[in-house]
Amino acid sequence: MANNSGDSKNTLYCSFCGKSQHEVRKLIAGPTVFICDECVELCMDIIREETKSSGLKSSEGVPTPQEICDVLDDYVIGQSHAKRVLSVAVHNHYKRLNHAGKTDIELAKSNILLIGPTGCGKTLLAQTLARILDVPFTMADATTLTEAGYVGEDVENIILKLLQASEYNVERAQRGIVYIDEVDKITRKSDNPSITRDVSGEGVQQALLKIMEGTVASVPPQGGRKHPQQEFLQVDTTNILFICGGAFAGLEKIIAQRGKGSAIGFGADVKENDTRGVGEMFGELEPEDLLKFGLIPEFVGRLPVIATLTDLDEDALVTILTQPKNALVKQYQRLFELEDAQLTFTEDALNAIAGRAIERKTGARGLRSILEDILLNTMFDLPGLDNVDEVVVNEEVVSGDAQPLLIYAERKEEPATVG
């Protein structure tokens, strides 16, 4: 321990913070160096934080499929089958990482393909999974990607975004999740191979193959195009989980056609028009349907886990508006609370909002724009009004036939002014 003599010549100092032995409780000596108790505590805090942020380290740290599914239920309404598929796939993926090298049997990675109409929850499912597992997450739009060397975004820029999301911690990035949206937009432009290069369709599928299967990507820290003088970060993509999503409009016709015969004439079977919903037909999806849609066989092979999502009906959309932890109605009610007013939606108003989203074919994604449109004038006027106690939205407001009803603290009622 340190010498506590008052002689200044013998005073010892911490080699890290510079404090003297008289300013700290303990000073620990090593070969030609000293460290105080405060610096030791700081080092322990850093180590604890690093351990906490390093993601899942043991099998006990991987949530069970049921635990993952329960958290997904808090944020995503419906889609129970897709949640079960995702929960099992993600649990197995991180269990595989935590037991790598402990057995002679090498467990292959199972990337995931989400298929469902616009606004059904594909992106939200992927985002919520990353939050549950506390791993870096990034999203990419497949329509902006091109083959290397062409104008557009390189595929390796996806890995750069993941690296940025992990604050350039390469080890954490290598255990992250990448969500690639709109993969149905990078299909072959025709069934037959062309003599001209398809740099934004099949070419992007080819470019994605390597990073999805596993490769060491050389990523320029500042992004942009590569050049020989640049320094690169090496990121191994072997353990990165890739989730691809798309609406795949028209895929249901391919599925329906597969079940029909092509015979004609008097002896042919006459089949009635298929009246099943899109989501129900997606449940009968086979890999060959994706090939006919325009995905190349190698790309389909990299996505062994397929989860199909269904259209959201009116009841599901109303539930999305009101029930999740971050439900839209709760968000707008909080905004109005900041203006000391209560926002109330009648039941018929909620049904009408859900009905408009279905008419627009925008699913849950279109709900916010509908609410913004309904509440715009009221949100404009409210900060300048006094004593407004409650704002009521009914079906007539949603249909555009009336403005939200303002109820004042002295119980005087009048329609909101049009801004």
From Swiss-Prot:
GO annotation terms (biological process): cell division; proteolysis involved in protein catabolic process
GO CC annotations, alphabetized: HslUV protease complex
Binding, ATP: P117, T118, G119, C120, G121, K122, T123, L124
Binding site for Zn(2+): C14, C17, C36, C39
GO molecular function: ATP binding; ATP hydrolysis activity; ATP-dependent protein folding chaperone; protein dimerization activity; unfolded protein binding; zinc ion binding
Assigned keywords, A-Z: ATP-binding, Chaperone, Metal-binding, Nucleotide-binding, Zinc
Superkingdom assignment: Bacteria
Sequence ranges assigned to domain ClpX-type ZB in this UniProt record: 2-55
Family per record: Belongs to the ClpX chaperone family.
Function: ATP-dependent specificity component of the Clp protease. It directs the protease to specific substrates. Can perform chaperone functions in the absence of ClpP.
Name the UniProt record assigns to this protein: ATP-dependent Clp protease ATP-binding subunit ClpX
Lineage: Bacteria, Pseudomonadati, Pseudomonadota, Alphaproteobacteria, Rhodobacterales
